[in-house]
Swiss-Prot record:
Gene coding for it: rplJ
Residues in coiled coil: none
Protein's recorded name: Large ribosomal subunit protein uL10
Subunit-structure text: Part of the ribosomal stalk of the 50S ribosomal subunit. The N-terminus interacts with L11 and the large rRNA to form the base of the stalk. The C-terminus forms an elongated spine to which L12 dimers bind in a sequential fashion forming a multimeric L10(L12)X complex.
Upper taxonomic lineage: Bacteria, Pseudomonadati, Pseudomonadota, Gammaproteobacteria, Lysobacterales
Any one annotated GO CC term: ribosome
Gene3D superfamilies documented for this protein: 3.30.70.1730, 6.10.250.2350
Amino acid sequence: MALNLSQKQEVVAELADIAAKAHSLIAAEYAGTTVAQMTAMRKQARETGVFLKVVKNTLASRAVEGTEFAVAQDQMVGPLLYAFSLEEPGAAGRLIKEAAKGNDKLKAKVVAIGGEVFPASHVDVLASLPTRDQALAMLARVLTEPVTMFARAIKAIGDKQNGGDVAADAAEPAAETA
């Protein structure tokens, strides 16, 4: 179905708004993907904070003008599916990688993040990025580990001064119960 001018302007405005908020973009070739596969991918995209859209390349190209994804405009050729990560940079990569496992017709073509374009092989790198929660957990572990190690060292020194060997103290109750 052909779009009239006002509908095209709405699509461009919607995509431009999404592109301005997005962390990363993956354009993937989807020709040959079944309706069931596409529906499952769209459902998963909604659940993971990925905006997924099939749109004419000229409209997508106009929508990304003035955003960090403008660098990918020259590679927007052929039937493409656009996946914008709205919450986490790696979400679109994980979505496309997961969907491609069960669909050999789905192939990433362009990966854009931070104003740079990467080859399709970088989808795996993008997909392996930790989620926000995982990154915060890693940061918390890195920040608390020195304090934890210091506390263990102080406790070991105190235990050694109070009664000698900590391992021997732990073995005594086991011997009494036998």
